[in-house]
Swiss-Prot record:
Stretches for region Disordered: 1-24
InterPro entries reported in the protein's UniProt record: COG4, COG4_C, COG4_M, COG4_N
Record PTM N-acetylalanine, positions in chain: A2
Role of this protein: Required for normal Golgi function. Plays a role in SNARE-pin assembly and Golgi-to-ER retrograde transport via its interaction with SCFD1.
Gene3D superfamilies assigned to the protein according to its UniProt record, in alphabetical order: 1.20.58.1970, ESAT-6-like
Protein name: Conserved oligomeric Golgi complex subunit 4
GO cellular component labels: cytosol; Golgi membrane; Golgi transport complex
Length: 785
């Protein structure tokens, strides 16, 4: 008997799965059922069989539900039968037509291939016949031409022979007429060698005699004989001799030039110019010959040889320039002078001026010449590279860059410009120092002499660097000028402003004198500039105001200089000078220059703040404090009396007008406007403080409103700035002080404010309302703002 406490273990019996498709057998076999003897096992199997039965019933029900759908689809299939038979017939017919067309096309294409093969063989036969005839014609023609000394015609026959297809000639030699062809070939080869020797000899004689027509005649024959490189080399040697002869003649003429001559200061630049112009004329004259007879891309070879000779002659001219102008010695003196602790006697900057001008002119002529070569070679390469690969184009570009950048001319000019930058720096620094030391002020002028002098010098130095046509040189000088203006020259103006505007109180005078003594002591220790003592208060005032004008003009001059440089360099870049990298470098230098202009503006603002706090604030504060002496808790009679005899604002306006008159005559309009703006801000701040410490009644508030309107009207006439915004808080205070009752503020506050933007906070509004002695504090506290 089985143990009924443990569950039955029916090996291999699994519960039936739901939704399995029909046609499957039960997983419980009849043999398994017969083998069961326990009631519990039989009940378990029975339950599983019942479950399988239910699944089968559901599947049968599902199939029966699909009966109508299946029957309708079968009817549709029966109806489609005839149509499918027609389609089958059409498809078979189409397949037959395609097979027929394919066979026909295959037959036709095979015929066409046979025709193409026959045509190609015919062309080859004709070509072979033509080449044999050409060979015979060339052999006969070259012999005749040589006898008649018609070297051009002989070269044309040789060129035609050289252009024949060698494989066709080789096939012809293997035919029946091979011996005759061999004989013709031998004669042609002998004629070729003979003609090459004749042309070389005739060319040498022509160059020796300087017979240009004969030189050009035989120069044109070289490429017909396949001697492109040799022809260009020999012709270049001839041209180089001419260049050398003319250059030596010009150099001798230069060395004999009298120093009183009008062009004596630039004779070496003129010599280089003549050299470059001579080579440029040679290139322009012979470029058509080279392109016509040698083909595109060959001009580079000719110019490469010419540039070698150009480098030799440039080296001679520059050596003479360095020796005669004492260029290296001058540079060493300048280097020593630039050292802070140098004891070497200083060179007078005027002595350097003509040398620096000549160097920049020499470099400008060199840059122009190199741009000419670049343009000519590039255009020649473009014609030949129209169908070339990208690799060939890049290789040609590398050759061009190497020729222009690595030639001795470029290296020599770079060396000269490198020394020039240091010497130009010395020239600029020394002349700026001299302009500062000789600074003078003429009565009636807003600025002193050093501003115009310094910027004339800076513009001259930068303009000279610009005339060199070297972006690197220009950027170096812009950077040096930026440093000179930012450090040394700005320090001079800064020191003058730090001496302060002469004060009126004892404490301010003491502070100003101490500051001035410290600054003068520091300047004298540095040894940069001489500091002259201030002999009187008036002179000190004028010095401060003139310095403010100087600072403002400096800022404007720097901005103008930046715009001018942008315009001038746009022309340079449009001429192909420099590239994207040079453009970025130049833009960076201009950004630094613009930053210096901003620093001068900042210095101007510092000076104005000092002037405002030293000269204006000590005067304005007592005038505003006199507001306390005028009661604003008044009756109708006093209000009418105030209207006839204003107790405060008219005197205050008169005091301001007298105070600002001194500055208006001595300051530029821009600075005066800025100073008036600072004064206005000061007035609003101080007046607000006074008002918040005063008390008012209704008529007193009305009186204050009239006073404020008069003050605003006056200040509006003396400045171009919009000042109503500065008085917004005070105007709103006047509005509040004019209210008839406390709750009237709600007509102007919050949603009822309209376009008005309140500058006063709710707490400040309550504070102003509390200034009215006739308003109860309980009413003010009850306001919901």
């Amino acid at each position: 008997m089985a143990d009924f406490d443990s569950p039955p273990k029916l090996s291999g019996v699994q519960p039936p799965s739901e939704g399995v498709g029909g046609g499957r057998c039960s997983e419980i076999s009849a043999e398994l059922i017969r083998s069961l003897t326990e009631l519990q096992e039989l009940e378990t199997v029975y339950e599983r069989l019942c479950g399988e039965e239910k699944v089968v019933e559901r599947e049968l029900d599902a199939l029966l539900e699909q009966q109508n759908t299946i029957e309708s689809k079968m009817v549709t299939l029966h109806r489609m039968g005839p149509n499918l038979q027609l389609i089958e017939g059409d498809a078979k017919q189409l397949a037959g037509m395609i097979t027929f067309t394919c066979n026909l096309a295959e037959n036709v294409s095979s015929k066409v291939r046979q025709l193409d093969l026959a045509k190609n063989r015919l062309y080859q036969a004709i070509q072979r016949a033509d080449d044999i005839l050409d060979l015979k014609f060339c052999m006969d023609g070259v012999q005749t031409a040589l006898r008649n000394e018609d070297y051009e015609q002989a070269a044309a026959h040789i060129h035609r022979y050289l252009c024949l297809d060698k494989s066709v000639i080789e096939l012809s030699r293997q035919g029946k007429e091979g011996s005759m062809i061999d004989a013709n070939l031998k004669l042609l080869q002998e004629a070729e060698q003979r003609l090459k020797a004749i042309v070389a000899e005739k060319f040498a004689v022509a160059t020796k005699e300087g017979d240009l027509p004969q030189v050009e005649r035989f120069f044109k024959i070289f490429p017909l004989l396949g001697l492109h490189e040799e022809g260009l080399r020999k012709f270049s040697e001839y041209l180089c001799k001419q260049v050398a002869s003319k250059a030596e003649e010009n150099l001798l003429m230069v060395l004999g030039t009298d120093m009183s001559d009008r062009r004596a200061a630039v004779i070496f630049a003129d010599t280089l110019t003549l050299l470059f112009e001579g080579i440029a004329r040679i290139v322009e004259t012979h470029q058509p010959i080279v392109e016509t007879y040698y083909g595109p891309g060959r001009l580079y070879t000719l110019i490469k040889y010419l540039q070698v000779e150009c480098d030799r002659q440039v080296e001679k001219v520059v050596d003479k320039f360095i020796k005669q102008r004492d260029y290296h010695q001058q540079f060493r003196h300048v280097q020593n002078n630039l050292m802070r602790n140098s004891t070497t006697e200083k060179i007078e900057p005027r002595e350097l001026d003509p040398i620096l001008t000549e160097v920049t002119l020499m470099n400008a002529r060199s840059e122009l010449y190199l741009r000419f070569l670049k343009k000519r070679i590039s255009s020649d390469f473009e014609v030949g590279d129209s169908m070339a690969s990208e690799e060939v184009k890049q290789e040609h570009q590398k050759c061009l860059d190497k020729l222009l950048n690595n030639c001795l001319l470029s290296c020599t000019m770079q060396e000269l410009i490198g020394l020039y930058v240091t010497m130009e720096e010395y020239f600029m620094r020394e002349t700026v120092n001299k302009a500062v030391a000789l600074d003078t002020y003429e009565k009636g002028q807003l600025t002193s002499s050093m501003v115009d002098d310094v910027f004339y010098i800076v513009k001259k130095c930068i303009g000279r660097a610009l005339s060199s046509s070297s972006i690197d040189c220009l950027c170096a000088m812009i950077n040096l000028a930026t440093t000179e203006l930012e450090s040394d020259f700005r320090d001079v103006l800064c020191n003058k402003l730090r001496m302060g505007f002469p004060a009126t109180t004892f404490q301010d005078i003491q502070r100003g004198v101490t500051s001035a003594v410290n600054i003068m002591h520091s300047s004298l220790q540095q040894g940069k500039f001489d500091t002259k003592g201030i002999e009187s208060t008036d002179e000190a005032k004028m010095s401060f105001l003139v310095t403010l004008n100087n600072v403002e003009v400096c800022s404007e001059n720097i901005s103008t200089l930046k715009k001018t440089l942008e315009s001038d360099c746009t022309k340079l870049f449009s001429q192909g000078i420099g590239g994207e990298q040079a453009q970025a470098k130049f833009d960076s230098c201009l950004s630094d220059l613009a930053a210096v202009s901003n620093k001068f503006r900042d210095l101007l603002q510092e000076g104005l703040t000092e002037l405002n706090s030293t000269a204006i604030k000590p005067q304005v504060q007592p005038w505003i404090n006199s507001f306390f002496s005028v009661s604003h808790n008044i009756e109708e009679e006093e209000f009418n009396d105030y209207e006839a005899n204003d107790p405060w604002v008219q005197q205050f306006i008169l005091n301001l007008e007298q105070q600002m008159a001194e500055f208006k005559a001595s300051l530029s309009p821009v600075i005066y406007d800025s100073l008036t703006g600072l004064m206005t801000s000061l007035v609003t701040v101080e007046l607000e403080k006074v008002v918040l410490k005063s008390t008012f009644n209704r008529l007193g508030g009305l009186q204050f409103d009239k006073e404020l309107r008069s003050l605003i009207a006056y200040l509006t006439t003396v400045t171009t700035w919009t000042i109503r915004d500065k008085f917004a808080r005070l105007s709103q205070m006047a509005t509040i002080l004019n209210l008839e009752r406390v709750t009237e503020i709600l007509d102007y506050w919050g949603p009822n404010s309209g376009p008005l933007t309140w500058r006063l906070t709710p707490a400040e509004v309550r504070q102003v309302l509390a200034l009215r002695i006739d308003f109860r504090s309980e009413d003010i506290k009850r306001l919901r703002l």
